A protein has these predicted regions:
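Signature of N-terminal electron-transfer/Fe-S-associated modules in redox systems
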Residues: 1-160, 164-186
Length: 186
């Protein structure tokens, strides 16, 4: 019996047609499997390998290399909080402390008692100009404050399942440079 639904397996089988190299489909395929199950089981990785006609060791290698793939159960809503230098200097540690207290966990990766939330500290999400920031349910959230965290938690407690991503984040545009670049005269 398959652990992945027929619909997800069909989506996975269609992925290679979207990429110039067949193997490039493995990450979106693993993402589909994880979205359906909540995390990647050995059986799910095997089914992804079979559906993509790839070596199971390759699929497992990709799943274990990238931190956004999970091999054990996580909360329904996963907070990835950037704690790299830019975010740390703008309050990421306070955001992490507030989040941990609000969801009732003590460690990175721990699941809240109600099973709804987990968090993980990550090195960089590529939006330093919006620090502190995080990714939640495939969406980026910027300029975080404890109040924004509380609002997101309240919203997610009402949500039956994580929303599918539509765009990258909150619609923010990067700040313009503080001064214009000039060509060096040579």
């Amino acid at each position: 019996m398959s652990v992945l639904s027929a619909h997800v397996l069909e989506e996975i089988r269609e992925l290679p047609d979207k990429y110039p190299q067949h193997r490039s489909a493995v990450m979106p395929a693993l993402d589909l499997a994880q979205e359906e199950l909540g995390y990647l089981t050995p059986e799910a990785m095997s089914e992804v390998a079979t559906a993509l006609q790839l070596d199971p060791g390759y699929v497992e290698g990709v799943a274990t290399f990238y931190t956004l793939f999970h091999l054990k159960p996580i909360g329904k809503h996963m907070f990835y909080v950037c704690t790299n230098l830019s975010c740390m200097l703008r309050g990421a540690n306070e955001i992490v402390d507030h989040l941990k207290g609000a969801i009732g966990v003590h460690e990175d990766g721990e699941v809240s008692k109600d099973g709804l939330f987990s968090y993980e500290e990550v090195e960089c999400l590529g939006a330093c100009e919006f620090a502190p920031m995080m990714r939640l349910d495939h969406r980026f959230h910027y300029d975080l404050t404890p109040e924004k965290i509380d609002a997101l938690l309240a919203e997610r407690r009402q949500s039956p399942s994580p929303p599918r991503a539509e765009g990258q984040g909150e619609g923010r545009e990067p700040a313009p440079p503080m001064r214009k670049r000039t060509k060096k005269s040579g």
